[in-house]
UniProtKB/Swiss-Prot annotation:
It comes from the Eukaryota. This is Uncharacterized transmembrane protein DDB_G0280771. It comes from Dictyostelium discoideum (Social amoeba). GO terms for cellular component: membrane. It is found in: Membrane. The keyword Transmembrane helix applies.
Length: 97
């Protein structure tokens, strides 16, 4: 059985301390790399969305204009909404109270 001397014990403690310090430095650098990587991904996605918006601006405008035209209803439809039997029954119950 080998006996550990005081010098060897101090040397092992020093190595352990350096190992812990190295782990913390590596973890810190890894966190920085992850943050920078996510930031780069975010910037690229924003730039891609801006470029695609500029390229397809007229197409998007036409699409939403057509959607807006489809949503406009004549005032006669708003005055006399089309009821299904269930919604008409519910409407009559609500009007009673």
């Amino acid at each position: 059985m080998k006996v550990i001397t005081e010098v060897e014990l101090e040397h092992m403690e020093y190595i352990d301390f350096n190992n812990e310090e190295l782990k913390s430095v590596v973890a810190q650098k890894l966190q920085i790399q992850v943050i920078v990587g996510l930031f780069i991904v975010m910037v690229v996605l924003i730039l891609l969305s801006l470029v695609s918006w500029f390229n397809y601006r007229s197409l998007l405008s036409k699409y939403y204009d057509s959607k807006q035209k489809n949503l406009k209803k004549p005032s006669s439809q708003l005055a006399n909404p089309q009821f299904t039997p269930i919604t008409k029954d519910l409407d009559m119950k609500i009007r009673r109270y």
